[in-house]
A protein has these predicted regions:
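C-terminal alpha-helical cap of glycosyltransferases
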Residues: 345-382
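Active-site-proximal region of nucleotide-activated glycan assembly enzymes
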Residues: 34, 44, 55, 114-175
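Structural loop-to-beta junction motif characteristic of Rossmann-like glycosyltransferase folds
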Residues: 54, 118-119, 259-260, 277-285, ...
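Glycosyltransferases and closely related glycan-assembly transferases
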Residues: 85-98, 105-121, 134-139
Length: 382
């Protein structure tokens, strides 16, 4: 009988791409597995998943933390609606497993799966779990975590340290991707899938200070949509070799070519950076829930695999200093690259895939299989 898996996650690339990595790994194992995603219409998933060939069910959902009073109230209103939508979708889909990989939709979908007694796996990306995953961990069957530091927040019999899931193309050997032209120092600037205004501004300021080195530097810069025109105009007038885009596809190749990565400190970004063995200047998003990005970044800083710059300390001068240190001390850069590579976890997706397969096999053995249980519910879903 064909197995069905529903994955909840999205909003940003940091939550979406681990889900895609898992979906592709499951399909490689068994092409007959049917996979669907649950996300929101406004999230990145609405653009990416159709292109990747996966079904997407959209529900009403929004974050609660870091919102103003009116926005928080609207988020609370959406929560029961999104949960009802999730439950109706699960009853129709009759999945054998639900996987929550973070993002606004994980909570409603996992809660619905628990009510319907569908096996559940959640994946916690950050070193310190958020309140939602701490609570969801109590009702799920299994929990996969990226950092060993976060395992203590969940039951020992449920939790497995897997690392953070990344797409297959990030797991190739170092030599699989050629570096850029010999002698050219390549800086990759990222603000996440939505861009980061403070990083964009600091980088534009740094260009003037780096003028004497512009013959040695190429900059690839993902700006996000809102700052794209402004940033592109500054680069065009700077004389630097550059590639400026609102969003970059084929990110693995960009990482492989990079000499230095300037980026936020989301768990997925750090997993990709370390899998490729790249040195990073980490600028944590200051409004991340529970300050988890700074905590993530400090793991790399402690291993001498990256440099931490807090957002309120960010300036063109700080960026210039970081680039020049990396450019002018190749031995230090090489040592940090090795440290980064050693931190990389290139089999995390396979570990999570195996947990999924174990749960699917276990569900088939049990008489109270999720699909049969759902048949006992008589609901009208419109």
């Amino acid at each position: 009988m064909r197995k069905r898996v529903v994955i909840a996650g999205g909003g940003t690339g940091g939550h979406l791409y681990p889900g895609i990595a898992l979906a592709k790994a499951l399909k490689r194992q068994d092409m007959d597995i049917e996979i669907a995603f649950v996300g929101t219409q406004k999230g990145l998933e609405a653009k990416v998943l159709p292109r990747e060939g996966f079904e997407l069910k959209t529900i009403l959902s929004a974050g609660l933390l870091g919102k103003k009073r009116l926005s928080r109230w609207m988020s609370w209103v959406k929560l029961p609606v999104g949960t009802a939508q999730s439950m109706c979708f699960l009853i129709r889909k009759r999945p054998d497993l639900v996987v929550g990989v973070g993002g606004y939709t994980s909570g409603p979908l996992v809660l619905s799966a628990w009510i319907l007694r569908i096996p559940i796996l959640i994946h916690e990306q950050n070193s310190i779990p958020g309140l939602t995953n701490k609570w969801l961990g109590k009702i799920t069957d299994k929990v996969a975590v990226s950092f060993k530091e976060s395992a203590r927040f969940f039951s020992r019999d449920k939790v497995t340290v897997t690392g953070n899931m990344i797409r297959e193309e990030f797991c190739q050997p170092r030599e699989a991707f050629p570096k850029g032209p010999r002698g050219l120092f390549r800086v990759l600037v990222l603000g996440g899938s939505q861009g980061a205004h403070s990083i964009n501004v600091a980088m534009m300021e740094a260009l003037e200070s780096l003028t004497s080195k512009r013959g040695n530097i190429h900059i690839t810069h993902q700006t996000g949509e809102s700052d794209f025109a402004m940033v592109k105009r500054v680069y065009e007038n700077s004389g630097f070799s550059h590639d400026v885009r609102p969003f970059i596809d084929g990110m693995a190749e960009q990482y492989r070519k990079a000499s230095l990565v300037i980026c936020r400190a989301g768990a997925t970004t750090l997993a990709e950076v370390t899998a490729c063995g790249k040195v990073s200047v980490l600028i944590p998003y200051p409004h991340a829930a529970h300050n988890h990005q700074e905590k993530n970044a400090r793991v790399l800083e402690a291993a001498n695999a990256g440099e931490l710059v807090l957002d309120h300390e960010l300036s063109g001068t700080r960026i210039t200093q970081s680039i020049l240190r990396a450019l002018e001390d190749p031995q230090r850069l090489e040592e940090m690259e090795e440290n980064s590579y050693q931190l990389g976890n290139r089999d995390a997706t396979e570990k999570v895939r195996q947990i999924c397969m174990d749960l699917l096999e276990d569900a088939n053995r049990k008489s109270g299989h999720a699909g049969k249980t759902q048949g006992n519910y008589v609901l009208s879903c419109f």
